[in-house]
Amino acid sequence: MNKIASFTVNHLTLLPGIYVSRKDKVGEEVITTFDIRMTAPNREPVINTAEIHTMEHLGATFLRNHKDWAEKIIYFGPMGCRTGFYMILAGDLESKDVVGLVTEMFTFMAEFEGDVPGAAARDCGNYLDMNLPLTKIVAKRFLDNTLTNITEEHLVYPD
């Protein structure tokens, strides 16, 4: 079997950032999958399940309610390796096109107060596995260390 594209990225040199993982054509529309990489794979700890689950709920809610981007959001969810998220948008986009959106989303997560959307037994299959206080710390760290003043090396996959 051939390696899928995401397994050809050198995870030993990959930095936290926002990367175009792939582009696919569906009918006449291009959809872009973004790799929102929050930790340096195999060099930093992965995100705990409670925090990544909370971020999934907050991020999906934020994106699907965004005044400018809601109609382009197809999917937002965690990577199985727990080092970040995939975000799929309608359109032929580049990483630089979504820096503002991703920064807004992580600011929303870092500053969120109140009940986590969908954190109820009726709404979620694992609603008890949430941790808002630590989620806010993880989101703020990504904002401060990666998204603020983001550079090209955090927007384009390494060779």
Segments predicted by a language model, with ranges:
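Short secondary-structure junctions
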Residues: 66-70
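Non-catalytic terminal extensions that flank enzyme cores
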Residues: 1-42, 156-159
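Generic structural motif
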Residues: 18-20, 73-78
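Active/ligand-binding-proximal structured segments within catalytic/core domains
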Residues: 31-65, 75-76
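Active-site-adjacent, His/Asp/Glu-enriched structural segments that form or flank metal-binding
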Residues: 76-149
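Low-complexity, highly charged intrinsically disordered N-terminal segments
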Residues: 146-158
